[in-house]
Regions:
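Rossmann-fold cofactor-recognition segment
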Residues: 48-63
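Conserved mid-core segment of classical short-chain dehydrogenase/reductases
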Residues: 73, 87-106, 147
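Active-site helix of classical SDR
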Residues: 120, 154
Length: 252
């Protein structure tokens, strides 16, 4: 049985990956979807070209991993793609967020880094030559971001982990792609807060276009997927310009 697994599938980028995977893989038997909101996953069944298997649960808790592990060991599927899309951010200074709710920033590290790593390790034995791992990073991974400090740091981890893991798995024919979009018009900003930076407002992208580009890039074997000219310029700019200068420029 050929499957794909998508975390964070109930909304935003994860939901869009589920919608488009049926076009990317013509012969998928199932997509296994993971998120906390079961009712959203059930509604997604009508939007997918491929049958869905629902795993409703919190990636910060052990239960969903056990359910997934049991299903993988029972079915022994050919896992064609793992999409690690679960994650969240919160804007504001470290001190401001700390005063609002102590655990938000450590939860961010748990979900964006620890859960992504745990999902990857759990799924690795079921990947074969031609399989893909797509990890949702962010353009914030390219450079430190004041007032988005913890989120940007977690996405730097995702980018670094993805690129190094991709090199390790290259000889097995497994591609790992880090998706690094700028601001995307999703529910993400309902929790994180609306972007205040003018450039971020002007470069807001649509989720379907970002996901379409990501799937094209992973099919081409690219280690990093960056959507849109502004973010590509940002990507190359962070390689050429001092990060101290870029950090200060973000405050304009």
């Amino acid at each position: 049985m050929k499957i794909a697994i998508v975390t964070g599938a109930s909304s935003g980028m994860g939901r869009e990956f589920v919608r488009q995977l049926g076009y990317f893989y013509k012969n998928l038997d199932e997509i296994w979807v993971i998120a906390r909101r079961k009712e959203r996953l059930e509604a997604l069944v009508k939007e997918s070209r491929v049958p869905l298997r629902i795993f409703a649960g919190d990636l910060q808790k052990k239960k969903v991993y056990k359910e997934l592990r049991d299903a993988l060991e029972k079915e022994q599927p050919d896992l064609r793609m793992l999409v690690n899309s679960a994650g969240f951010g919160k804007s504001g200074s470290v001190e401001e967020i700390l005063s609002e709710k102590f655990r938000i920033q450590t939860d961010m590290v748990d979900v964006n880094c620890r859960s992504l790593t745990r999902m990857t390790l759990l799924c690795l034995p079921f990947l074969r030559a031609g399989s893909r791992i797509v990890n949702l990073a962010s353009a914030s991974a390219f450079c430190p971001q004041p007032y988005f400090s913890v989120y940007a740091a977690t996405k730097s981890y995702v980018l670094s982990f993805s690129r190094s893991l991709g090199e390790e798995l290259r000889k097995k024919g497994i591609v790992v792609t880090a998706v690094c979009p700028g601001p995307v018009d999703t529910e993400f900003f309902k929790f994180s807060g609306k972007p205040q930076n003018i450039l971020k407002k002007l470069t807001m992208a649509k989720a379907d276009r970002v996901v379409h580009q990501a799937l094209k890039d992973c099919r081409s074997g690219k280690s990093v997927s960056v959507y849109g000219i502004p973010m590509k310029l940002t990507y190359f700019g962070t390689k050429l310009l001092p990060h101290g200068f870029l950090v200060r420029m973000q405050q304009i």
